[in-house]
């Protein structure tokens, strides 16, 4: 739909709304919500653009995912191989009812003549739910897919506890973004998200965060002490 965006959904309606949504993470849900794209040129994927439903909870986490696809084998029979994923993205209040770009740490190489399954993955959480918008209908069965990562689907008793693929007819509002500027902007964000002082330190240090948010932090001593 532009020089950098590859999309299949119908976008929002005249009022700026999608025609539905799908939960990807919440108290009883951890789904991969994906759609299939065929490539007609070699490109580098820098991010996925997705519509965050206003039913989502600010603070919920999601991530962008890319699968390499074997179109001769169904997803359920092993036709998808996880190729890459982004770091976790925390939904903000400003993201609700809006499009957001979720960048990959490094560009993902995609090749002419190959098919890929791209989408958004959520996480089980007792209170923080994440919903992705839907707009339009599939052209064929298997064009859009759901992966129940932990077999949590209460409507599929036979596969309880078993990771399971399904197809659905609603089109995920997930788009490929090949804009090269996403790479540098993500790098800058990672560099300025916090400040550590004093440096050097005697073992006690202060971490000053750039904004109020939920963070996961790991401290490693590279000297092995």
Q: Where does each model-flagged region fall?
A:
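Short beta-strand elements
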Residues: 1-25, 36
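Low-complexity, Pro/Thr/Ser/Gly/Ala-rich linker/spacer regions in secreted
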Residues: 2, 178-190
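Short beta-strands within extracellular/lumenal beta-sheet-rich domains
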Residues: 26-39, 99
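Extended extracellular/luminal ectodomain segments enriched in beta-structured repeat modules
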Residues: 39-49, 59
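Aromatic- and Gly/Pro-enriched, solvent-exposed loop/edge beta-strand patches characteristic
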Residues: 60-142
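Short, surface-exposed beta-strand/loop patches at domain edges
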Residues: 120-181
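C-terminal outer-membrane/trafficking sorting elements
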Residues: 187-225
């Amino acid at each position: 739909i532009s020089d950098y965006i590859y999309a299949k959904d119908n976008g929002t309606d005249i009022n700026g709304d999608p025609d539905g949504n799908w939960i990807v993470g919440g108290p009883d849900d951890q789904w991969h919500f994906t759609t299939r794209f065929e490539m007609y040129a070699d490109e580098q994927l820098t991010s996925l653009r997705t519509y965050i439903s206003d039913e989502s909870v600010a603070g919920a986490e999601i991530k962008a995912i890319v699968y390499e696809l074997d179109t001769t084998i169904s997803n359920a029979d092993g036709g998808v191989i996880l190729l890459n994923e982004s770091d976790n993205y925390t939904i903000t209040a400003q993201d609700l009812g809006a499009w957001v770009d979720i960048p990959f740490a490094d560009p993902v190489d995609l090749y002419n003549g190959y098919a890929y399954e791209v989408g958004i993955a959520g996480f089980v959480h007792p209170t923080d739910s994440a919903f992705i918008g839907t707009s339009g209908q599939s052209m064929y069965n298997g064009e859009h897919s759901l992966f129940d990562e932990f077999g949590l689907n209460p409507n599929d008793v036979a596969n309880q506890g078993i990771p399971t693929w399904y197809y659905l007819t609603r089109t995920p509002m997930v788009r490929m973004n090949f804009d090269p500027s996403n790479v540098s902007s993500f790098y800058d964000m990672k560099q300025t998200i916090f400040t550590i002082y004093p440096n050097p330190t005697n073992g006690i240090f202060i971490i000053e965060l750039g904004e109020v948010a939920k963070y996961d932090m790991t401290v490693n001593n590279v000297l092995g002490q």
